[in-house]
Amino acid sequence: MSRSTLAITSLILALSVPAVNAQVSEGEYIATLGDCVACHTSNSEQPLAGGMAFPTPVGDVYSTNISPDKTHGIGNYTLEDFIKAMRDGVAKEGHNLYPAMPYTSYAKMRDEDLEALYRYLMDEVEPQAVANRPTDIIWPLSMRWPLAVWKWFYHDDSQFEPDSKQSDEWNRGAYLVQGAGHCGTCHTPRGFAMQELALDGTNDKYLKGAELDGWYAGDIRGDLYSQEEMVALLKTGRSDKEAVLGPMADVITHSSQHFREDDLNSIVTYVRSLSTTPVSAPTQLAQASESAKTDYKMYCGTCHGSDGVGRDHIIPALAGNSTVLADNPASLVNILLHGGQTATTKAHIGYNMPAYDWKFNDQQAADLLNYIRASWGNQGAPVSAQNVKAQR
């Protein structure tokens, strides 16, 4: 090889390196958008090695090893294999994946984003020699061929199509919410076959709220929150009135706090644009009892205040709180019984809400929650002892 040829070759290689590194960096960001680590990491010392349990009506399924390990992970996947898994829900070995893996959302992702994600997983993630855990689903329910039928009815593998009538910001938000962010996985109600009843905003059931694993992922359509408040919740897990606990706190810890500012604003712009119906007042209102008032003063008032206003950006207010007033009280009951932790972010350390399942029986817990739902201007529907019992 001549010196001139060598020099030209070296220059070409040097110029190509930033492009490759930029793609890998973008791939890591896409992994953050998709919150891959939250579902595919059950042991923090073995990131992306799988093993996280996902309850289903027929038994638990477990997330798989998506590290580049060639024996247990995806180290032998080609880019085409990877895209087929992400978009069609089919593993390299040919079996159908359970839709606990939200390929119904990932199908909307662009090829270039899937390729960047693939390059990140293959080139920057450490291989983890951890075997995949088999499902707890018993035969014959464990046969996977019915999943092909399920997909025939409920899976749309088409990519996201921008709406020319909307702004670039709106379209970016729609792409992230419907695709990598897979927000509908938790926030969209499901049908009898556990399918999401809508996959985009053209259907008013999309993001309308759903109960999942004992938590209620609320209706996030429309302008319940201001642009600034919703961005703050996604970035810090807190606003001047509310704090996020439960599964969404994990999403904020691992994922949304790291989103670029313009992406956060795009997401909120899209979600706030979705039409919603005004929430009507409950036909029956919760009632506050004297015994529950005493319990509140003893166990809740020190932090949340006798007036229910909490402490700004530290302890959430109970007055006017959307979780407190939700028609579905699942999250509220869950927090009282089992406690919870807020998101840990760059701006705030997480703090714990203590569990009170040891202190209150079902009726006492219901009475306390009814006191909260009926005080300081709150007008919530009553919580029953049966609601509490279902969450123990």
Regions found by a protein language model. Name each.
Residues 186-236, 253, 322-359, 368:
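Structured core of small recognition/catalytic domains
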Residues 1-23, 45, 61-64, 85, ...:
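Post-cleavage N-terminal segment of exported redox proteins
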Residues 272, 276, 301, 305-308, ...:
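Hydrophobic alpha-helix feature that most strongly marks membrane-spanning transmembrane helices
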Residues 37, 73, 125-126, 182:
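Primarily extracytoplasmic ectodomains and periplasmic/lumenal surface modules that are beta-strand-rich
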Residues 60-76, 81, 87-112, 133-135, ...:
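Axial heme c-ligation environment in periplasmic c-type cytochrome domains
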Residues 23-41, 47-55, 147, 151-152, ...:
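Sequence/structural segment immediately N-terminal to covalent heme-attachment motifs in c-type
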Residues 212-214, 281-289, 297, 310-312, ...:
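Flexible internal linker/loop segments at domain or repeat junctions
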Residues 32-41, 64, 81-87, 99, ...:
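C-type cytochrome heme c attachment motif
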